[in-house]
Each structure stands twice: as structure tokens, then as C-alpha cells.
Amino acid sequence: MAYPLEKALDVMVSTFHKYSGKEGDKFKLNKSELKELLTRELPSFLGKRTDETAFQKLMSNLDCNKDNEVDFQEYCVFLSCIAMMCNEFFEGFPDKQPRKK
């Protein structure tokens, strides 16, 4: 039986590999692969309209080694940043249900 966090990690890894390597290095996401991943897997993050300038800036910020691709480590940093933003957002809300022990 997989635990929720194990399932989350599996989804994180398998989602990266679902999109990486379609057009090149199988261990990296190029610009179009990253855009497809975000559009299909994180549609709320991009919103209804994709601003090309904003996407270019995101790609540039994620691509720490400036190879014009996002590797798994860069992808993990991105997901970690999103998780931290979500956590900060929800810290301001009172609990509606008691926490499970």
C-alpha cells in the first residue's frame, strides 16, 4: 500500500518523464515540452491565456544552467516553490476540520 506522500512523489517523477524527451534529451524538458506539461498538468498555474513573455521569463528562471532545457532538478525546484507558495497562502486560513493524527 502506497502512502499519500509516496504517491505524490511518484506522480511528480512520472509526470516529468511523461513529457521529457519527446523532442530531444529524454532527461530534460525543452521549451515546448515544458509548456505542454504546464498546460496539461498545471492549467490553473498558467491561467486561461498563455502570456509568451511571462512563459519565457519562467523558462529562463527555471533554467539555472542556461542550457535552454529544464532538467529534473530544476523541475523539482519549481514544484517546491509552488508548494511553498500554496503553503503560505493557506497558512492564513483557520482549520475547518480537525487535523488527522
Swiss-Prot record:
Cellular component, GO annotation: extracellular space; nucleus; perinuclear region of cytoplasm
Single GO MF descriptor: calcium ion binding
Residues annotated for Ca(2+) 1 binding in this entry: 28, 33
Location of the EF-hand domain: 13-48, 50-85
GO BP annotations, alphabetical order: positive regulation of canonical NF-kappaB signal transduction
Subcellular localization(s) per the UniProt record: Secreted; Nucleus; Cytoplasm
Keywords: Acetylation, Calcium, Cytoplasm, Metal-binding, Nucleus, Repeat, Secreted
Positions carrying N6-acetyllysine: 7, 35
InterPro entries named among the record's database cross-references: EF-hand-dom_pair, EF_Hand_1_Ca_BS, EF_hand_dom, S-100_dom, S100/CaBP7/8-like_CS, S100_Ca-bd_sub
Superkingdom of source: Eukaryota
Annotated Ca(2+) 2 binding sites: 63, 65, 67, 69, 74
Sites of N-acetylalanine modification: 2
Pfam families, per the entry: S_100
Subunit and partners: Homodimer. Interacts with PPFIBP1 in a calcium-dependent mode. Interacts with PGLYRP1; this complex acts as a chemoattractant that promotes lymphocyte movement. Interacts with MYH9; this interaction increases cell motility. Interacts with Annexin 2/ANXA2. Interacts with TP53; this interaction promotes TP53 degradation. Interacts with CCR5 and CXCR3. Interacts with FCGR3A; this interaction inhibits PKC-dependent phosphorylation of FCGR3A.
Biological role stated in the UniProt entry: Calcium-binding protein that plays a role in various cellular processes including motility, angiogenesis, cell differentiation, apoptosis, and autophagy. Increases cell motility and invasiveness by interacting with non-muscle myosin heavy chain (NMMHC) IIA/MYH9. Mechanistically, promotes filament depolymerization and increases the amount of soluble myosin-IIA, resulting in the formation of stable protrusions facilitating chemotaxis. Also modulates the pro-apoptotic function of TP53 by binding to its C-terminal transactivation domain within the nucleus and reducing its protein levels.
Protein name (record): Protein S100-A4
Organism annotation: Bos taurus (Bovine)
